[in-house]
Amino acid sequence: MRVWIDADACPKAAKDQVVRFALKRQFEVVLVAGQAQIKPAFACVRLIVVPSGPDAADDYLVEHAVPGELVICSDVPLADRLVKKGLAALDPRGKEFDAQNMGERLAVRNLFTDLREQGQVSGGQAPYGDREKQAFANALDRILTRLARQA
């Protein structure tokens, strides 16, 4: 099994949680980034730095991840591409992307993008705290268990 991470936008705490699961459950973690990052010093972790460019890391993830694997990403359009390819996708706050919720997630994302562009909404997400870390760990455990059963 392999877990891919869109590393540029993923909080360090979430990346660290995936590595802890990987050490315990014996799977590979692939960090895909558009810029250099510090790679955790474990054999189960690989870092791939893609050439810079719009959506280069996203395109790499869509091209290389295969059904039965999990991708951690915050990017809703990327998650849509992954789900359509048959992959499991999870955001660092513990919300799984799936065929049933992608339409709604895309609509909400597009609405907030439009509102931000019009100056009607400012700011971003709440800080990544203990509640988000716990929700992510719970969802990660649930999805990894499901994928292991399907393998």
UniProtKB/Swiss-Prot annotation:
Pfam families: DUF188. It comes from the Bacteria. Belongs to the UPF0178 family. PANTHER family: UPF0178 PROTEIN YAII (PTHR35146:SF1). This is UPF0178 protein PFL_5989. It comes from Pseudomonas fluorescens (strain ATCC BAA-477 / NRRL B-23932 / Pf-5). The lineage of its organism: Bacteria, Pseudomonadati, Pseudomonadota, Gammaproteobacteria, Pseudomonadales.
